[in-house]
Amino acid sequence: MSSIDPKQFGKVAVLLGGNSAEREVSLNSGRLVLQGLRDAGVDAHPFDPAERPLAALKEEGFVRAFNALHGGYGENGQIQGALDFYGIKYTGSGVLGSALGLDKFRTKLVWQQLGIPTPPFEAVLRGDDYEARSKEIVAKLGLPLFVKPASEGSSVAVIKVKSADALPAALIEAVKYDKIVVVEKSVEGGGEYTACIAGNLDLPVIRIVPAGEFYDYHAKYIANDTQYLIPCGLAADEEARLKVLARRAFDVLGCTDWGRADFMLDADGNPYFLEVNTAPGMTDHSLPPKAARAVGISYQELVVGVLALTLQD
């Protein structure tokens, strides 16, 4: 990556913490981002919106923000709208891309309309008859299924359901986190992958092999036995094709600059996109630093490069 004068950035806030279910992940990400930026000579400071009003950013002379918030208002367009209002440049997607990207239900609706392959699904609303909906969904989609709150990240409250009897309880648990729940047909046979996006960098696809049944919160941030395969094992031309498709899945939602697109392959190698992440984790377990490191880009270079994307607007 080309050398960047850290003075170009001015005073930078690293947004971290927040009040979503992913607060601890965000704190971990933010601390590492902060250290990486400071090591590069950037005038960076921590800022937790759960503890201080956003107006303080403008009052204290911040001109730029690295968004290390995860979930909730940090990813759903609210923080982005406030930063736009205060005239502060920020990393990641804008209001529309952030709002759509966090909402798995509406993401899948857009993808369906535009021909991006995504697993068959049904939506369940808080207050529905969970027993009746469970019977309808199993009859339509079969088993196994994944139950996901529409607007939580880091696999918070994601439940794999293998029997029809277990689905109502999974729905009852998921609606505690969101009023809309996505019930998605499980894609089996070809593995789970992610394509990391950071400007024009050509980052490798990563295959994720969790020790447990799927890549849940524990596998993402706690376990040390999750395998991340780089190279991912796909033929070079197939990997290149999937990176192009991942970029399209990201772009059609209005997402910009950097993030991730996660997908599964079935037994025949057909891809099914699950979600995008517009503010990916940046912990020592997280995927973008792993992808960057595989092509010789250090953590410090990555965070400075992501921040540098705010200079292009």
UniProtKB/Swiss-Prot annotation:
GO terms for biological process: cell wall organization; peptidoglycan biosynthetic process; regulation of cell shape. Gene3D superfamilies: 3.40.50.20, ATP-grasp fold, A domain, ATP-grasp fold, B domain. Pfam families: Dala_Dala_lig_C, Dala_Dala_lig_N. ATP binds at residues 138-193. SUPFAM superfamilies: Glutathione synthetase ATP-binding domain-like, PreATP-grasp domain. Mg(2+) 2 binds at E275, N277. Disulfide bonds: none annotated. Its EC number is 6.3.2.4. Residues 108-308 form the ATP-grasp domain. Signal peptide: none annotated. One of its GO terms (molecular function) is D-alanine-D-alanine ligase activity. PROSITE patterns: ATP_GRASP, DALA_DALA_LIGASE_1, DALA_DALA_LIGASE_2. The keyword Manganese applies. It is found in: Cytoplasm. It comes from the Bacteria. Its cofactor is Mg(2+); Mn(2+). NCBIfam families: D_ala_D_alaTIGR, PRK01372.1. PANTHER family: D-ALANINE--D-ALANINE LIGASE (PTHR23132), D-ALANINE--D-ALANINE LIGASE B (PTHR23132:SF23). This is D-alanine--D-alanine ligase.
